[in-house]
Amino acid sequence: LEAFLPHAAEAGKPHCPTLIFARRFTRRAMTQTRMPARRLPATGVVAAIVALIVTFVSSTIAIAQDLPVKSGEKIAFLGDSITAAGSNSPSGYVWLVIHGLEANGVKTTPIHAGVSGNTSKDMLGRLERDVIDKKPDWMTLSCGVNDVWHGAGGVALDPYKKNITEIVDKCQAAGIKVMILTSTMIGEDQANDNNKKLVEYNDFLRGLAKEKKCLLAELNGDMQAALKQPEGAPPRKGNLLTVDGVHMNPLGNQMMATGILKGFGLSEAQMEKAHDAWLDMPNAVEVTGKVNVTLRQYDRLSKLAESQHRSVSDLVNEEVGKAVETLEKSAPAD
């Protein structure tokens, strides 16, 4: 089988996904064949299996080719601190988009263009340097939170419309395809004044995407839907998707990445592949815990760490990791 599988030949790994499928399929084909395997011509069995495998691999590649974004392309992520954080963490939305595409056979390169505190005016001012000069194939545009949130220091609706339109026009003139993201919420309460003001900004973005034939990721609607509680449910304590009402936590980053991938046209089955890839990413989320110990305990930890040529923090983090695995095993099934 390996001779017929270029992916396996290239990887040379027994756990290559295509090879795993081939082996499982072979076993299934041999056990489900009505005629005993010994009475089938060996070459006929192999030929049939190979034909089905080739069909499977070809269909997988075809699905990836049907997406508007292709392998080898570059995606610029233009935005503010939400985007900057989305680039700086392995579980940030920028990297989740990249890994989600890769899980579906589309390998792309990110161009990180998020700057903390930026408004539409700021993004327009650095567009040439941070995006156009780097010649991406795609750009996602996340802008609106600071234009509203910063009040008098932000950008009113009319100049915002002008700035965003100019950003899109310049990118399209440079041959860059654009996906517009509706602005995420400012506080996890749609009834607050900032979110009410943001409605007009997002309405404009939806209209502009349609007018300029840009892809659209409906992140604001997705965020509102995720935060909606059943009727009669008690008020939620703390934030669900953000660390502070604005900047995303791991769940919020997954929400954003999901919206962007759907904007790129990924199917439900492809989204499942993306989510599965995210869930098993190593060191994706840093969980910080406060551990109080006595001086005697600290002295012992220090000696143990020194004997292993490690730091106390590394030692404690390893034990916390083991505790998380234990808790996970005892948690109720999904």
Positions of predicted regions on the chain:
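N-terminal secretory targeting modules
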Residues: L1-L78, T83-P90, I98-K107, D133-D137, ...
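Alpha-helical cap/lid subdomain in secreted, periplasmic
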Residues: D66-S71, S91, W95-T109, N118, ...
